[in-house]
């Protein structure tokens, strides 16, 4: 049984726009139908979830198999501050001590994960929330950078539970928390999780929804989005990107090098950017290909 979308979502679109969108989208729908796409839902855009959820459900109605990986950094910081604990970073990565790890797990695997699952289901979808611990989906190990504390790296991925859910037309929603073989809980970088899952699942596309419109040629001009890059061009960005864009671009490069057909970085704060990027010729964000 395919996902059933809330009819109100379609009614919001004018007749002329419906025809235009469907005509342009049809070749892309035919090409990607039944293919897996991994969408990384950045913590900075979680508050814009209503429109993004509609886009995700539209894609599932078209037959795309969607896997969602989410972050939640801003909300983690809010909870840390409520407990009078200041967020700590080392080389741009969150330092995760035992108390911080408990908050990270509570926020990501609890609040944010269930919020997204609830939103999808309320709009007629069928979502199930997971974290790396569930069915040993992701086995973690300690980072080689001891300064980071309980920040982990991916040791193994066992995707069978995702395969089972996709076969039954569910949308897996995954929080980036996992345990090691000895049961220690680790905080994983959600960008890395999304990229590695895309490779393991043999996804055709990896999509990052962020608070910027894409990869910018000029960091001071938000409209200077680079539409398409090959791997060589993406690797040459090392000196022009910074902060949270670095792990996203690196994950895109790794995914494309390992069989993912295309990786996208797009803005999540404006309506329907996901559909415009995937189902139109012009697109809206940045796409990295071989």
From Swiss-Prot:
Pathways per UniProt: Amino-acid biosynthesis; L-arginine biosynthesis; N(2)-acetyl-L-ornithine from L-glutamate: step 2/4
Residues annotated as signal peptide: none
Keywords: Amino-acid biosynthesis, Arginine biosynthesis, ATP-binding, Chloroplast, Kinase, Nucleotide-binding, Plastid, Transferase
Listed CDD domains: AAK_NAGK-C (cd04250)
Cellular localisation: Plastid, Chloroplast
Transition state stabilizer (site feature) positions: 40, 248
Binding-site positions, substrate: 72-73, 94, 187
Claim: Plastid is one of the keywords in the record: yes
Catalytic activity: N-acetyl-L-glutamate + ATP = N-acetyl-L-glutamyl 5-phosphate + ADP
InterPro entries: AceGlu_kinase-like_sf (IPR036393), AcgluKinase_fam (IPR004662), ArgB (IPR037528), Asp/Glu/Uridylate_kinase (IPR001048), Glu/AcGlu_kinase (IPR001057), NAGK-C (IPR041727)
Family: Belongs to the acetylglutamate kinase family. ArgB subfamily.
Protein name: Acetylglutamate kinase
Organism, scientific name: Cyanidioschyzon merolae (strain NIES-3377 / 10D) (Unicellular red alga)
